[in-house]
Amino acid sequence: MAVFTAVSDSDLAQWMRHYELGDVLAFRGIPSGIENSNFFLTTTRGEYVLTIFEKLTAEQLPFYLDLMRHLASHGVPVPDPIPRDDGALFGLLHGKPAAIVTKLDGAAELAPGIEHCIEVGQMLARLHLAGRDYARYQPNLRSLPWWQENVPAIVPFVSDAQRALLEGELAHQAAFFASDDYAALPSGPCHCDLFRDNVLFAHAAPGTGHDVRLGGFFDFYFAGCDKWLFDVAVTVNDWCVDLATGVLDVARADALLRAYQTVRPFTAAERRHWSDMLRAGAYRFWVSRLYDFYLPRAAEMLKPHDPGHFERILRERIAHTPALPETHTACN
């Protein structure tokens, strides 16, 4: 979400001719993140986000945009892609795929409490179930094959201890992914990047009995078809940790996981491999952050994340992982 590709006023004016969104009132780059170029766009018709996709190809993009439309049609609050005048959900800007989506209400909660975790857990389970009949398929592009391809490029930059952990965990995950239990885990479209800054909350309406309302999930451009438990693990590793140490906050994790399984109970195989999947979720982001830190791309506004954060989380998950909470009756 850093700005890698600049958009001038004349570029924007030409681009907006393909949309019926009124006159542009404001336009500014979003500096956070490291993958795509994102801009807040305000017009006389409303508020939107313009994204230029720096890595995803025109062949890959329909999976993500159509998934967002599919989830929205099933009641999951996500950004809605805006069709162009030819009906397409994206076009080319500076030779790169680009799209406009609706901007969700609310703000990110960077210090979540129990109620935030409950809201996220329930909606993540609803997202998984809503995606069961989604017709397109795209694997998680940052899964085991990506790790195997890119870890060798990273190891020259790290310490001996880090190299041992990188290579040892890669071997552990490769064996896990090859197991019959892994093959049996429930799967489908996953967000794969449901961090605190990819969820918005708004104030709940009076009389609802809640202090917060989930405004929506966004930034689906790491989404892919994967094991649902991986998506849960990625989410817990961000929403339910002490950011300074990586230690799991058991109360928040318990709240999120219990809320999730009121919608979709965990299977026996998922319970057996919760620790493995928490490790996989931590490893995925440690590897990608190491790659972005040591092998960055040029960008106008680039703020690489600290790789050490997910190294600490991975070491913590290897040392200790509580069991999944007991199953509750599902409700849809």
Swiss-Prot record:
Superkingdom field: Bacteria
Keyword Ribosomal protein: no
Pathway annotation: Amino-acid biosynthesis; L-threonine biosynthesis; L-threonine from L-aspartate: step 4/5
Catalysed reaction equations from the record: L-homoserine + ATP = O-phospho-L-homoserine + ADP + H(+)
InterPro entries per the UniProt record, alphabetical: Aminoglycoside_PTrfase, Homoserine_kinase_II, Kinase-like_dom_sf, Pseudomonas-type_ThrB
Keyword set includes Amino-acid biosynthesis: yes
One BP annotation, GO: threonine biosynthetic process
EC nos: 2.7.1.39
Listed Gene3D superfamilies: 3.90.1200.10, Phosphorylase Kinase, domain 1
Keywords: Amino-acid biosynthesis, ATP-binding, Kinase, Nucleotide-binding, Threonine biosynthesis, Transferase
GO molecular function terms attached to this record: ATP binding; homoserine kinase activity
PANTHER family: AMINOGLYCOSIDE PHOSPHOTRANSFERASE DOMAIN-CONTAINING PROTEIN (PTHR21064:SF6), AMINOGLYCOSIDE PHOSPHOTRANSFERASE DOMAIN-CONTAINING PROTEIN-RELATED (PTHR21064)
Sequence similarity: Belongs to the pseudomonas-type ThrB family.
Name the record gives this protein: Homoserine kinase
Organism: Burkholderia ambifaria (strain MC40-6)
